[in-house]
């Protein structure tokens, strides 16, 4: 089994590409979905967030209010680093558990949808392919303002909190250009899916002989360490 990292910037279209890959039968682990799970009430991350950020980040039902928390961390790099130090280990732990489940079920590759893939770099050493969903800056800004009902200043602040898309584009093996129509994006997703399929047989044969010496073996060791830590 091999791993494919899918990333991009806020409002660049990662969710669109992820959904299209799921429709093609690809197993996808979404870090944003996992992130919501690991901060549910009574989890370790939830308790630490409340301890460091206070009761004001909670909604009336006691759950983390993502909008309130977002307003804090996107205006303070220090607070953002603190939140990441709380949530990222728990997110990676849960993702690694899901990867192992897909491996046990016999899947030949898994796509990891990780917004901060290149910022944290904790998972990049285990990836065979990396994919960036790219759109031009003007399109990204417009989409974010419309999607989250933000002012231009608020949207620019959130975009600047991440690594620039142009820089991410230069780090990836594959780029999906998502500035145009949904149909054009889908054609690119189909081409990516075909490339992944084409390399499957080679990797299956190769994995039988060298799995213990490659990233998969390292992944198991890393998983044991992080789960038992």
Curated annotation (Swiss-Prot):
Which residue intervals define the domain DPCK in the entry? 3-207
The residues the record assigns to binding ATP are 8-15
Keyword flag ATP-binding: yes
UniProt keywords, alphabetically: ATP-binding, Nucleotide-binding
Molecular functions (GO terms): ATP binding; dephospho-CoA kinase activity
Q: Which GO terms describe its biological process?
A: coenzyme A biosynthetic process
Q: What CDD domains does the record tag this protein with?
A: DPCK
Question: What SUPFAM superfamilies does this protein's entry cite?
Answer: P-loop containing nucleoside triphosphate hydrolases (SSF52540)
Give the residue spans that cross the bilayer: none
Q: Which domain of life is it from?
A: Eukaryota
- Return the InterPro entries for the record: Depp_CoAkinase, P-loop_NTPase
Q: Which NCBIfam families match?
A: dephospho-CoA kinase (TIGR00152)
The record's similarity note reads: Belongs to the CoaE family.
- Put simply, this protein is called Dephospho-CoA kinase domain-containing protein
User: What is the native source organism of this protein?
Assistant: Danio rerio
């Amino acid at each position: 089994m091999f791993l494919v990292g899918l990333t991009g910037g806020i409002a660049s279209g990662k969710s669109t590409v992820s959904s299209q890959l799921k429709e093609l039968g690809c197993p996808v682990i979404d870090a944003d979905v996992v992130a919501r799970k690991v901060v549910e009430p009574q989890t370790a991350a939830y308790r630490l967030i409340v301890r460091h950020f206070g009761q004001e980040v909670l909604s009336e039902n006691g759950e983390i209010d993502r909008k309130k928390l977002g307003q804090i961390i996107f205006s303070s790099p220090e607070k953002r680093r603190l939140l990441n130090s709380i949530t990222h280990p728990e997110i990676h732990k849960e993702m690694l558990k899901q990867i192992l489940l897909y491996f046990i079920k016999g899947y030949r590759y898994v796509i990891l949808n990780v917004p901060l893939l290149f910022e944290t770099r904790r998972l990049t050493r285990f990836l065979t392919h990396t994919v960036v969903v790219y759109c031009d800056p003007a399109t990204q800004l417009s989409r974010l303002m419309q999607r989250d009902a933000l002012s231009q200043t608020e949207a620019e602040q959130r975009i600047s909190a991440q690594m620039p898309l142009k820089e991410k584009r230069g780090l990836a093996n594959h780029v999906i250009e998502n500035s145009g129509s949904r149909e054009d994006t889908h054609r690119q997703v189909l081409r990516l899916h075909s490339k992944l399929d084409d390399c499957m047989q080679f990797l299956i044969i190769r994995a039988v002989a060298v799995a213990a010496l490659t990233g998969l073996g390292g992944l198991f060791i890393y998983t044991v360490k992080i789960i038992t830590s």
